């Protein structure tokens, strides 16, 4: 039976008044005596206390919490020989350094086909404990009383689960920033590692960090030129990716942002899932910093180790640009000086965003804010939906919006850009509409009676004569729905709006007075007053950007889009 199910099973048996007997065949291990050489923060002490109360369980906390140092304290307190399981050589090197620093012990290693284990505290790469190209587990030299699984969300993979279940250690703990899996297989993690014993919210983590958190949306004009033989619907996602990574205008935008970051004394990390993309950007950034380093995870273990050592040896006084694949830098990439992240390749999942953001979340002398440049390809529907999911992640992570063109807004208290949830946006959005003097442009994929009535009441009855009001919506798919849509369009037009129907429209966007942009996944004005949001609606988010430059650029692109296509 998976160890993580023991408590739940016992509770079930007790509630049924069923008798039971436990045969405990766990390994207690060999006693060790290592002193902990550091002092934990209050949050780390709370985490350690919970772990000591339980033989198994998970510490869930983001990068910068200090999961490694907390685990080192746990090793000292448990006083039993320990094996630490990691996924990569980069993580192995980090753990070697941490064990030496916090426990004053040089740990053994099992990696690259070489077993240099001590039987006291050892670190092993998961793949080194199984036969080549097989899930068959190799014979082990030592038995351990405690196993610590770093990045334990990987336990849901069969090979790692199979390995984790092969240990009979009395104590088994998992460490992760993202216990919830995109594929929904987190139960496997809990079966092998136990329940979550301690977790920190993003807001709690932010309090532990000595810097502010900002994301900067950069709206890209990337799109396909009209092609009578191909439509957006029958293009493959890979064809989009192939065109995106070689789009010169987009790459120039990214390169300029990176160069400006370096000029401002920042240290950027550029992440893409395509090596070809990184190589193109590397050429664009040649001589833009004292050190421009491309890390992809390719090469032998020795080559990768040498590359990391070179990166770690760069003095903090020297300018640095790092380009890396998301897979390589997503875990175990420890460069505390990094303060700027360029997300230059589209992705959707919030867990991936949390991992990538974590690369910036280590305290470092002189780091007072971290910035994430997110390149929003809003003209490609599939990429736009990916961005909408990332936006939800930024809000959960406690990030604030920042735009380059803040000068015009800086002196106005009510002009700050912000991320809103569905429950939060209504008051400020309706106030922006009610105060419109010059123009309102609204993109609504679907019209409802509530939206139509709200828009007429808030805007069309109050906006000054001569103001421009445009509403764009998606053409109804059926004749019945078209009839309903036409009736609502007629109401809007009779009230003074110009309405245009489009064959394709996915964006939910509002541009007010050519200076305020609302953009996200919220279906504006769709809910009646005193409406209780559904669980799905509660997930939706939108951003308010107070920037004439950004608002006018997006409006020009979106209004003119139909004419191009």
Language model segments and positions:
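Conserved Walker A/P-loop ATP-binding site and its immediately adjacent core
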Residues: 68-101, 273-278
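Conserved interdomain hinge at the start of the Helicase C-terminal
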Residues: 232-273, 279-284
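Signature of lipid phosphatidyltransferase scaffolds
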Residues: 387-392, 396-413, 516-565
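Post-DEXD/H (motif II) to motif III coupling segment of the RecA-like Helicase ATP-binding lobe
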Residues: 145-146, 153-216, 394
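Walker A/P-loop
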Residues: 54-75
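Conserved helicase ATPase core of P-loop NTP-dependent helicases/translocases
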Residues: 93, 108-110, 114-117, 279-280, ...
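Primarily the HKD phosphodiesterase
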Residues: 432-494
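Conserved SF2 helicase motif VI
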Residues: 61, 179, 348-372
């Amino acid at each position: 039976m998976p160890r993580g199910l023991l408590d739940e099973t016992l509770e079930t048996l007790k509630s049924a008044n069923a008798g039971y007997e436990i045969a405990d065949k766990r390994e207690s291990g060999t006693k060790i005596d290592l002193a902990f050489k550091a002092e934990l923060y209050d949050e780390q002490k709370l985490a350690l206390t919970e772990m000591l109360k339980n033989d198994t369980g998970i510490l869930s906390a983001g990068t910068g919490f200090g999961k490694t140092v907390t685990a080192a304290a746990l090793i000292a307190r448990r006083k039993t020989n320990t094996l630490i399981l990691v996924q990569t050589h980069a993580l192995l090197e980090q753990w070697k350094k941490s064990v030496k620093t916090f426990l004053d012990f040089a740990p053994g290693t099992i990696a690259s086909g070489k077993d240099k284990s001590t039987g006291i505290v050892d670190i092993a790469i998961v793949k080194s404990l199984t036969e080549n190209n097989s899930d068959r587990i190799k014979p082990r030299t030592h038995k351990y009383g405690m196993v610590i699984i770093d990045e334990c969300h990987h336990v849901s993979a069969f090979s790692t689960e199979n390995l984790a279940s092969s240990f009979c250690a009395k104590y088994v703990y998992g460490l992760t920033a993202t216990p919830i899996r995109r594929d929904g297989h987190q139960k496997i993690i809990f079966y092998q590692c136990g329940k979550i014993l301690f977790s920190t919210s993003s807001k709690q983590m932010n309090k532990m960090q000595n810097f502010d958190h900002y994301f900067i949306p950069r709206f890209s004009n990337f799109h396909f030129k009209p092609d009578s033989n191909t439509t957006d619907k029958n293009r493959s996602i890979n064809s989009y990716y192939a065109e995106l990574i070689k789009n010169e205008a987009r790459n120039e935008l990214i390169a300029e942002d990176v160069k400006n970051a370096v000029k401002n004394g920042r240290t950027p990390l550029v992440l893409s899932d395509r090596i070809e993309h990184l190589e193109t950007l590397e050429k664009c950034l040649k001589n833009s910093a004292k050190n421009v380093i491309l890390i992809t995870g390719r090469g032998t273990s020795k080559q990768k180790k040498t590359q990391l050592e070179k990166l770690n040896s760069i003095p903090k006084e020297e300018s640095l640009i790092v380009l890396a694949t998301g897979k390589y830098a997503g875990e175990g990439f420890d460069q505390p000086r990094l303060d700027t992240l360029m997300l230059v390749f589209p992705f959707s999942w919030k867990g991936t965003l949390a991992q990538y953001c974590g690369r910036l979340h280590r305290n470092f002398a002189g780091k007072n804010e971290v910035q994430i440049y997110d390149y929003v390809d809003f003209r490609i529907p599939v990429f736009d939906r990916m961005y909408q999911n990332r936006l939800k992640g930024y809000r959960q992570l406690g990030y604030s919006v920042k735009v380059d063109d803040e000068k015009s807004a800086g002196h106005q208290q009510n002009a700050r850009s912000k991320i809103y949830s569905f429950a939060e946006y209504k008051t400020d959005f309706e106030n922006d509409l009610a105060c419109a003097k010059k123009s309102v442009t609204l993109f609504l994929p679907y019209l409802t009676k509530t939206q139509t009535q709200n828009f007429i009441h808030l805007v069309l009855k109050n906006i000054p004569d001569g103001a421009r009001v445009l509403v764009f919506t998606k053409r109804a798919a059926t004749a019945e729905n078209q009839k309903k849509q036409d009736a609502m369009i007629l109401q809007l037009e009779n009230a003074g709006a110009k309405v245009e129907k489009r064959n394709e429209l996915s964006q939910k966007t509002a541009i007010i007075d050519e200076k305020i942009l609302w953009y996200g996944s919220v279906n504006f004005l769709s809910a009646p007053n005193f409406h209780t949001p559904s669980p799905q609606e509660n997930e939706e988010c939108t951003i308010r950007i107070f920037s004439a430059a950004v608002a006018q650029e997006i409006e020009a692109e979106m209004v003119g889009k139909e004419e191009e296509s």
